[in-house]
Amino acid sequence: WADVDRAWMKIKTPIQIGHPLEYYEDHFRKAVALEWDIRLTNPKFAQNDHRVNKIKSAFAKIYSSFEPNTKSEEYKKIYDFSFKSLDKVQLYVGRPALFFGAEFNGMFSAQVVPNDEIVSLEEGKKIFAFSDEILQTSRAKPFLKLSREIFGQELLTKDRMFLFNETASWHQVYDISTVGHEYGHILWCDEQTESVMNKTGNFKNIEEFKATT
C-alpha cells in the first residue's frame, strides 16, 4: 500500500482520485468503507505559495521566541523538517464529483493525506478542501429551535447574513480555520513523532488540538 501511496502522490492533475485508504464512519451501518472518489479542483484556487509563506512566517516567529536550552538543537531539526514538509504539500480546493455512498452526505470537509509518514517523507502530502461544498450545505440548513434557544435569534440572523451576503469573507474564514488546520498537522512533527507518541496512544488526540491551535 505504500507503493500505492507513492504512485497516488504523483497524480497532480486538477481531476483527483480520493485517497484509497482514507476511512469515513458510516453512521447508518456503524461500519467503515474504503473511500474511492473523484474530485474536481476549482481553478480559482490554483496552487500558490501565499498560504505556505504566511504559515512559515508565523512558524518562524514562534520558533524565534524560544529561549536557548539543552533541547535547542533537537527543536531546530523539527523546525527544519517542518519547513521542508510544507514545501512538499499539494493543495486541492474543489468539489467531489463522484463518490461511493452518494446519499450519505456530510463526508466532505477537509483532509490531509497520506498518513504513512515514510511515504510523506519522500513525496509530501496532499490537502483536500471542499469550501464550496461546505458553503452550500451550510446555506441549506434551516434555523433550529435548539440553536435559537442556545445562541439567540440575533446571533443566528447575523450569522445567516454573513453566510449569504459575504461569500468572499466566508471563504477567507474557511481558508484560515479549515485549510489552516490541515497545514497545522504538518508543523512541529518529524518522521518519528507519530510512532513515538503512539506508544501511549496519545498522538491523534494531541495532534488535533495542536493543528487547531
Annotate the PLM regions:
Residues 160-170, 192-202:
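Acidic/His metal-coordination segments adjacent to aromatic residues that form catalytic metal sites
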Residues 1-161, 170:
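Contiguous, non-catalytic segments that form substrate-binding/exosite surfaces or channel walls
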Residues 176-190, 211:
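Active-site recognition of the HExxH zinc-binding catalytic motif
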Residues 187-188, 196-197, 207:
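Extended hydrophobic-aromatic, low-complexity segments
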Residues 172-176, 205-207:
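Alpha-helical scaffolds flanking conserved acidic
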